[in-house]
Amino acid sequence: MHYARIASKLREKIIKFSGELSAGMPKVVCRFIAESLYGIQVRQSVRLTEIARSLEEKIPLRKTHSRLSRQLGRAGLWRKITHSLFRMSCSHIKEDTLLIMDLSDIAKRYARKMEYMARVWDGSEGEVANGYWTCNVVAAEVGEMVLTPLYSRLFSQNAPDFRSENQEIFRAISMVSKQTDKKGSWVLDRGGDSREIMDHFLDEELEFILRSKGKRHVIYRGRKDSVYNFALGCTLPYMERVVREEGKQEKIYFLEFGVRPVKLPGREDRLYLVVVRGFGQEPMMLLTNKPVKRSRKSIWKIIDSYITRWRIEETLRFIKQSYNLEDIRLLTYRRLQNMMALVLAVAYFAMVYLGLKTKLRVLARHVLTAAKRLFGIPDFRFYALADGIQSLLFRHQKGFDSFKNMINTQTSQLKLFDP
């Protein structure tokens, strides 16, 4: 298939996707979403100036920029896009689907005038910097490569509506669980074992797998002690070998693991402490309310579920790097939050939408071949996919007028449904 024809089909898919995403929204919002999804991918940037350039309008660039900025500042846009993505994605969520939550940062080291900017821990540099936090949820299946971005919200502890980090976590849990009918198991890293978070999961009858720091006190056989002390005394009768990619190398880990039934003080809910040795000097401690039997298969299922969580780190790097997220240059808090919803939608398009049907899978393979990389396509194919989309759309803009006509046709058809 000729690359120009693939580029044309990509534009058609972007239009179709944006139409599903913006269904029921006003005409001007539908057009804005379509243009933003196109611009972010063709320029691999979240800067409004770059998105405006991609549209190649026959008016001064500043006027296009002003129009995009005005629409990006719409109240309620983040929630509308997020709920539209829920509608599209929640059919993928099954009883055993993992709902992996991660708190990340967007460092803005040299920014001075961005609204409600706070001090955050810049994980890539290992130091405190100006910026914002993001709360992200990605759905995954154990043993499968498919990852489904579900939720992404930017927040700052300096914003007037901020209450606490836990409240941001509860907001994400509440919104996702409501849409999935409480299906899936939540997976959180260290810090997720705070008593407030665990009580929330138990009160809402949600399944979870949380990594413990070891300080949390639990009860085992009527005795109260720290998770760490109980982990040290746990028998580890089973062994398993795992291979983890670290950088460009593979590292082999030989793991020993076991389980103990425990309870939280003041609660009757049965929990299980899964203990794993082999990742380092200290044991890895997982707390879960999922039923666990004293068998290799049952215990390993919990460990394998948590290990799957590592893949979300690569997902977040993909989103940050492929769309240059830390180069975001928006002065108002609402626009920053709305842009995160658009980036989430772009990630969903690249990671999920292009793989939903056989024809789209074929298209995805063609796009992968268009991403010219020195060492070929990496195992994490979304990087190459994003590069391929950018390459095709950027190099084959001959049909861009037809793309704009498709936007106008779509928004005209949607006019009947405008509120």
For each predicted feature, which ranges?
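Single, function-defining residue in the core of a domain
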Residues: 1-45, 54, 84, 97, ...
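Active-site-proximal, Lys/Arg-enriched surface segment
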Residues: 37, 65-142, 256-261
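Short, basic interhelical loop/turn and adjoining N-cap
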Residues: 54-67
